[in-house]
């Protein structure tokens, strides 16, 4: 009987050692996820530890000051976004992990902003939404679309997460559509809804490939061309009209032209030599609203190139001689000095080029002197 006592003690010690080993090497529990509102105070308990337990707190691996503790509890006041992180409390002596909290600081959602538009009429329309202020934590959106009392499918956009598409089931319907959206997160929820007629949300995309060119030999004209938006599915059955605006860069005031058809227009009142900016908008002929303005095109009206004229005064001098380098005109006769001094009369100053009429007048004067 006495020999059985040591065996009993060994069994107890082995069980205790196994319990300690299991506690130290067992997988750590996942941290508790907690959401708190920005600007509030929060108290984080150290799991099941008693209030007076000796513990140490860390956030993201950095020790926290002891004056933040109330017993074993961590007190965080006036929460800021920077308070978000992984908080852990440890037994002060053994550094055994007692508890972990993954804290997220954020805000409940405000009323979402919702809008719907048909840029592919008559195929369908899309709705998009966003929050007017960030929440800093994950949000979940839920959209419902009603056509009268009939629920319609809103297909998620593959590229834009805050957009979905609805196909028109009954074209030219007079029944209103109602679109509602709700948003929720860990701190709250909010909703909004809009009701509209089919034709009121028709708004094409802006015209594409707007090009402006000068018109040769016309200093006040610009030729503007553009294309119907590629997203407009049937321009033959549902034609668009266009609105063109233009101005010189030196002025702030726009000039406007509305065009019922066609994808070209010639501006006839441009300022010569001034650069212009031109934009075009589109709208269904009957319903809806105008598109946004297109990408701006720039152009300057045609200007005549300056002519480079060379005059005798502008021609560079190539000699210091007083003799002209230009050929004499057809009425000019080149005379010999000896011809003018023959007959004993007074000598006429030497000229390299004397008109025939002057020569005849001089000869007559000489003959008259001889007769006297």
Swiss-Prot record:
Lipidation residue positions, type GPI-anchor amidated serine: 342
Similarity comment: family membership: Belongs to the type I cytokine receptor family. Type 3 subfamily.
Superkingdom to which the source organism belongs: Eukaryota
Tissue: Nervous system.
This protein's domain notes: The WSXWS motif appears to be necessary for proper protein folding and thereby efficient intracellular transport and cell-surface receptor binding.
PANTHER family reported in the protein's UniProt record: CILIARY NEUROTROPHIC FACTOR RECEPTOR SUBUNIT ALPHA (PTHR23036:SF21), CYTOKINE RECEPTOR (PTHR23036)
Pfam families: fn3 (PF00041)
Protein name: Ciliary neurotrophic factor receptor subunit alpha
Quaternary structure annotation from Swiss-Prot or TrEMBL: Forms a heterotrimer with LIFR and IL6ST. Interacts with heterodimeric neurotropic cytokine composed of CLCF1/CLC and CRLF1/CLF-1. Either alone or in complex with the heterodimer CLCF1-CRLF1 interacts with SORL1; this interaction may promote internalization and lysosomal degradation.
Disulfide bonds: 46-89
CDD domains in the record: FN3 (cd00063)
Glycosylation sites: 60, 70, 142, 190, 261
Originating organism: Rattus norvegicus
Entry's Gene Ontology BP terms: brainstem development; ciliary neurotrophic factor-mediated signaling pathway; motor neuron apoptotic process; negative regulation of motor neuron apoptotic process; negative regulation of neuron apoptotic process; positive regulation of cell population proliferation; sex differentiation; skeletal muscle organ development
Presence of keyword Glycoprotein: yes
Cleaved signal peptide residues: 1-22
Keyword Cell inner membrane: no
Gene Ontology MF terms in the entry: ciliary neurotrophic factor receptor activity; cytokine binding; interleukin-11 binding; interleukin-11 receptor activity; signaling receptor binding
Phylogenetic lineage: Eukaryota, Metazoa, Chordata, Craniata, Vertebrata
């Amino acid at each position: 009987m006495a020999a059985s006592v040591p065996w009993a003690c060994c069994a107890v010690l082995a069980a205790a050692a196994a319990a300690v080993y299991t506690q130290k090497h067992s997988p750590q529990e996942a941290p508790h996820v907690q959401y708190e509102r920005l600007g509030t105070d929060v108290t984080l308990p150290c799991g099941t530890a008693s209030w007076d337990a000796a513990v140490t707190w860390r956030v993201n691996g950095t020790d926290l000051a002891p004056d933040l503790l109330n017993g074993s509890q961590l007190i965080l006041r006036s929460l800021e976004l920077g308070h978000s992180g992984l908080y852990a409390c440890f037994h002060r002596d053994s550094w055994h992990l007692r508890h972990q909290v993954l804290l997220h600081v954020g805000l409940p959602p405000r009323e979402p902003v919702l809008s719907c538009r048909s840029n592919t009429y008559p195929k369908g329309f899309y709705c998009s939404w966003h929050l007017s202020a960030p929440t800093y934590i994950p949000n979940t959106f839920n959209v419902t679309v009603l056509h009268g009392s009939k629920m319609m499918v809103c297909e998620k956009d593959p590229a834009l997460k805050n957009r979905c598409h609805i196909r028109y089931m009954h074209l030219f319907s007079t029944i209103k559509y109602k679109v509602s959206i709700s948003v929720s997160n860990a701190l709250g929820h909010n909703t909004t809804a809009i009701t509209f007629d089919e034709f009121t949300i028709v708004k094409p995309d802006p015209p594409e490939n707007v090009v402006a060119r000068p018109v040769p030999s016309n200093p006040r004209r610009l030729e503007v061309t553009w294309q119907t938006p590629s997203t407009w599915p049937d321009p033959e059955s549902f034609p668009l009209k266009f609105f063109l605006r233009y101005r010189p860069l030196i002025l702030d005031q726009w000039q406007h032209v509305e065009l019922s058809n066609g994808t070209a227009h010639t501006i006839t009142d441009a300022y010569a030599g001034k650069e212009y900016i031109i934009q075009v908008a589109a709208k269904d002929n009957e319903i809806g609203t105008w598109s946004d303005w297109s990408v701006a095109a720039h152009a300057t009206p045609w200007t005549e190139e300056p002519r480079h004229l060379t005059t005798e005064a502008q021609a560079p001098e190539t000699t210091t001689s007083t003799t002209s380098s230009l050929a004499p005109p057809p009425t000019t006769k080149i005379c010999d000095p000896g011809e003018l001094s023959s007959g004993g009369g007074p000598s006429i100053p030497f000229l390299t080029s004397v008109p025939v009429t002057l020569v005849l007048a001089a000869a007559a004067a000489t003959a008259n002197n001889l007769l006297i």
